[in-house]
């Protein structure tokens, strides 16, 4: 054990094990997660060479092989609980992604949420065992987030009781679905439904694309891999073109919308019910943002405790770089953010399942806010985590640029989250649409509930500076509850600004669509402020549920740092809204620096509490034992370029040197 890390752990003010239990949900969940992780760590079938040194084709082959082993092992060990499946999957491929991932994250959830009982009986068991390997084919070459613009068609033929699927244009070719290129034999295809000559919008269809047994594409199907990408080397993101391809009527998922044998269309209770899978994935992605940022913080903070550089005072020993205030300022707000997102992710998971149960009972009342909240928080957390991961990499200096740090892999494999399942700016605008509707309700004298209930407090449906002029004396920068109120006022103010600017543009431009576009910057800022408020609120409320005093104290410091750092980075909003005064902003900036000092002694213990196995981090720099330099040298020696003392390419240089 590196002596610096041992000293850091000995000086912690709390027991990291107890905090791990809180993050997992209970001591029993921690015990079971570790039990599952050890199944993999102690199983020789899951050992493999470092994927960093393999070609893309080799990485894909390893990923497919290990995915097949994973399914067999889960069956052998009786792992069926969704959380346990996630733990198992997260460790078996370390920091990399799996070709069959969408089978479990989208194909099966869509079948569960939108399939009839008969459809689930037909396909569910086979998809869980990978006899059917499914993917989710929504995005097309020409359209992604704009779902209504998708061009793939499914035209019903009542004579044969079949749907005829077509990709009528080049831009209608399905493009990007993971596992589509070479792995999957089925796809849930989103297509424009046409029956009796009339279009009814997007619906989901289960489409066989390869013959089971030979794995060859079926007649009418053109399918393949789209080529190398920024990351995701193990995933065969693919394309799918369909030419008059017929599937039975029963292959349309019909839990909500239906097409009768004669072609009669039966509409669902709500069109948004067909977007259930996207809402599920977006809520899941909030937790994934927390996980990715937590891993990056673990690597950067451990390395910063091991790395010694420069001199604070001439002639003195080189300090740990974690002792530099600038390094703390880079990393500790990100650590606070990681914890905030951990708690928000747990909230979103719980909220999704609660509301989804209600939807199953026919209660759609909370669906609009769930859709808006998952869209906004997916964007807010993924943008923040993506920027934060890169900041952690840069905080590790030159070694952070090496794949040995694990940070490049974390970054390139997380960054697609800013685009898939809804491009983030568009997601923020979807949240803004809900905020504008809520504002209009309040303006018309109605009350709103849920996370937007703060809009009910708008005095006479307006926030005016003179009406909140007394507010600055009320803000307590040492109180999470008081800071939550400040964020609430900021959100309300920016929502009102966006709403009033939108109204002005509507009057001036006459067209709501043009007005919306010309107000979109304000609308995105309103959504960001709303999401920021939600995160601060949930973090603050989580503190009240923590019973261990030492853990509550350190989490309170993190909550304060997250809230105050956000104010310092958005000071203009709090000043312009007369929510805080300039002297208070100065106090905020000073308090942020004080909190850096308070958190310093607990930083390593806080990342230890995330409880990532070394193999999960995939990082030489973030090793639990802190033995960085010895292992960095060993890692480099494994480079394929080092297999020969003289590389075969030397012949090109030798010919030049012979002329000297």
Swiss-Prot record:
Organism ancestry: Eukaryota, Metazoa, Chordata, Craniata, Vertebrata
Gene3D superfamilies assigned: Acyl-CoA dehydrogenase/oxidase, N-terminal domain, Butyryl-CoA Dehydrogenase, subunit A, domain 2, Butyryl-CoA Dehydrogenase, subunit A, domain 3
Pathway as given in its UniProt record: Lipid metabolism; peroxisomal fatty acid beta-oxidation
Assigned EC number: 1.3.3.6
The protein's name in its UniProt record: Peroxisomal acyl-coenzyme A oxidase 1
GO function term, MF aspect, one: FAD binding
Protein encoded by which gene: ACOX1
Record family assignment: Belongs to the acyl-CoA oxidase family.
Pfam families, per the entry: ACOX (PF01756), ACOX_C_alpha1 (PF22924), Acyl-CoA_dh_M (PF02770), Acyl-CoA_ox_N (PF14749)
N6-acetyllysine PTM positions: 216, 255, 267, 272, 437, 446, 500, 512, 637, 651
Main location: other
UniProt organism field: Pongo abelii
Motif Microbody targeting signal: chain residues: 658-660
Quaternary structure, from the entry: Homodimer. Interacts with LONP2.
């Amino acid at each position: 054990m590196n002596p610096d890390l041992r000293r850091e752990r000995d000086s912690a003010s709390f027991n990291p094990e107890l905090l791990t239990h809180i993050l997992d949900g209970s001591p029993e969940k921690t015990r079971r997660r570790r039990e599952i992780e050890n199944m993999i760590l102690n199983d020789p079938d899951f050992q493999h060479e470092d994927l960093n040194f393999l070609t893309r084709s080799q990485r894909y082959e390893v990923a497919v092989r290990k995915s097949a082993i994973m399914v067999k092992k889960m069956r052998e060990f009786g792992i069926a609980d969704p959380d346990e499946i996630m733990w198992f999957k997260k460790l078996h491929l370390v920091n990399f992604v799996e070709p069959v991932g969408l089978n479990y994250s989208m194909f099966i959830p869509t079948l569960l949420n939108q399939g009839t009982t008969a459809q689930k009986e037909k396909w569910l068991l086979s998809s869980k065992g990978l006899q059917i390997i499914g993917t989710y084919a929504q995005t097309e070459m020409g359209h992604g987030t704009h779902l209504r613009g998708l061009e793939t068609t499914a035209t019903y033929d009542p004579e044969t009781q079949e749907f005829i699927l077509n990709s009528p244009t080049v831009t209608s070719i399905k493009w990007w679905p993971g596992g589509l290129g070479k792995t999957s034999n089925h796809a849930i295809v989103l297509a424009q439904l046409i029956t009796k000559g009339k279009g009814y919008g997007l619906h989901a269809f289960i489409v066989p694309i390869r013959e089971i047994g030979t794995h060859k594409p079926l007649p009418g199907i053109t399918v393949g891999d789209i080529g190398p990408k920024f990351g995701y080397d193990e995933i065969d993101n693919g394309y799918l073109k369909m030419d008059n391809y017929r599937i039975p009527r029963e292959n349309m998922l019909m839990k909500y919308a239906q097409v009768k044998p004669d072609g009669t269309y039966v509409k669902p209770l709500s069109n948004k019910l067909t977007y259930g899978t996207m809402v599920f994935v977006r809520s899941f992605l909030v937790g994934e943002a927390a996980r990715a940022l937590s891993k990056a913080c673990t690597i950067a903070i451990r390395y910063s405790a091991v790395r010694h550089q420069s001199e604070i005072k001439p002639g003195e020993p080189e300090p740990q770089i974690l002792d530099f205030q600038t390094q703390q300022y880079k990393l500790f707000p990100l650590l606070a953010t990681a914890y905030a997102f951990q708690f928000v992710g747990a909230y979103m998971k719980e909220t999704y399942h609660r509301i989804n149960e209600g939807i199953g009972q026919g209660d759609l009342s909370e669906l609009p806010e769930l859709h808006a909240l998952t869209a906004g928080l997916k964007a807010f957390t993924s943008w923040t985590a993506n920027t934060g991961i890169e900041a952690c990499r840069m905080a590790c200096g030159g070694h952070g640029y090496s794949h040995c740090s694990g940070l490049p892999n974390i970054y390139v494999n997380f960054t697609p989250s800013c685009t898939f399942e809804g491009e983030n700016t568009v997601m923020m605008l979807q949240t803004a649409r809900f905020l504008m509707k809520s504002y209009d309700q309040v303006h018309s004298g109605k009350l709103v509930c849920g996370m937007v209930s703060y809009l009910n407090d708008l005095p006479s449906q307006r926030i005016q500076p003179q009406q909140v002029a007394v507010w600055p004396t009320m803000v307590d920068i040492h109180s999470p509850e008081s800071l939550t109120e400040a964020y609430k006022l900021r959100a309300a103010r920016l929502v009102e600004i966006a709403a009033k600017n939108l109204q002005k543009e509507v009057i001036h431009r006459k067209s709501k669509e043009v007005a919306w576009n010309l107000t979109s910057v304000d609308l995105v800022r309103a959504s960001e402020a709303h999401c920021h408020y939600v995160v601060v609120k949930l973090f603050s409320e989580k503190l009240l549920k923590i019973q261990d005093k030492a853990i509550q104290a350190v989490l309170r410091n993190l909550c304060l740092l997250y809230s105050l750092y956000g104010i310092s980075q958005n000071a203009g909003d709090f000043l312009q809204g007369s929510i805080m005064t300039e002297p208070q902003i100065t106090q905020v900036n000073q308090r942020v620096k004080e909190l850096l000092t308070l958190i310093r002694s607990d930083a390593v213990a806080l990342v230890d509490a995330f409880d990532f196995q070394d193999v999960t981090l995939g990082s030489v720099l973030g090793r639990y034992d802190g033995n960085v330099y010895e292992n960095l040298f060993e890692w480099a020696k494994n480079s394929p370029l080092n297999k020969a003392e003289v590389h075969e390419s030397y012949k090109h240089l030798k010919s030049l040197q012979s002329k000297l």
